[in-house]
Amino acid sequence: MATHLTAAGRSARWRAGAAGAAALGLVLTGCGGAKVGGSEAGSGGSSGKCGTFNLAVNPWVGYEADAAVVAYVAEEKLGCTVKKKDLKEEIAWQGFGTGEVDAILENWGHDDLKKKYVEQQKTAVEAGPTGNKGVIGWYVPPWLAKEHPDITDWKNLDKYADKFRTSESGGKGQLLDGDPSYVTNDAALVKNLKLDFKVVYAGSETALIQAFRQAEAKKQWLLGYFYEPQWFLSEVPLAKVELPPYEAGCDADAEKVACDYPVYDLDKIVSKKFAGSGSPAYDLVKNFSWTNEDQNLVAKYIAVDKMSPEAAAEKWVKANPGKVDAWGK
């Protein structure tokens, strides 16, 4: 994590046109687990000072890119102390009520969690779109789509099921998913489309990427869950399998889903208390917006070029001053 900066003059200049310069009336929690409003946390003040900003980081590199850039700007421009917290998706939402999480930067739909935490518990509020379009689906390596072009139609998958068998798929074709915490309807899809496949979890985004990379290099049969935005698609342009078209409401019952995933307008979720705190970090989160291409570039810096998240963020921020300045207006 970058060092907490106290350059008040620089911070004030960047925030000059920002809304929400009101006093920070809420004390945020630190890593030690102090509750929201607790005396242990060290923020506060009477001039919109940032204090501690608790940022959830979900387990995929695109989100890591979001968090890297927002954290860098919060520290360099606003003088915040950013506490990044590596959390699975639903665990992060639980943190809104305890004061352990202020913001989630990339929410993929999750209408169920919005109902629970925004509508029912009222511990969270929506903070607008990220600008990213999220696509989830089933993919095969390019070589496979080229040699068997009909494989990109789900109706033909069973014809090739035996080719996808592995030691973990129990005599059925393997459908490889990533982290079990990701948004997925795949088990229901396999069941409801009556496919001779079994969902097997790679365990992480890194493992899923490596499986596709190896499948392309060694011409191995692989059908797997994947998504955009994702830098890896510029390295290996996976071919998407066409599932039954998505229609509004076709995924309303999770057990009966038999359609493709929707295109998600990814959005930001923050704690209700954070939204009303007057913290300039909230204004930054609310105004933060970029494209799939922006995210993929920073993610590539981290995953491929092996830059630290801080260095990757610094490189992108310095190359895109216009976009960054817009977040402070």
Regions inferred by a protein language model and the residue ranges of each:
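Bacterial lipoprotein signal-peptidase II cleavage site
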Residues: 28-43
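Short helix-initiation/N-cap motifs at beta->coil->alpha
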Residues: 58-61, 81-95, 200-211
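An extracytoplasmic/periplasmic, membrane-proximal ligand-sensing/linker region
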Residues: 62, 182-198, 202-219, 280, ...
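A bilobed periplasmic-binding-protein/Venus flytrap-type ligand-binding module shared by bacterial periplasmic
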Residues: 136-146, 263-277, 300-301
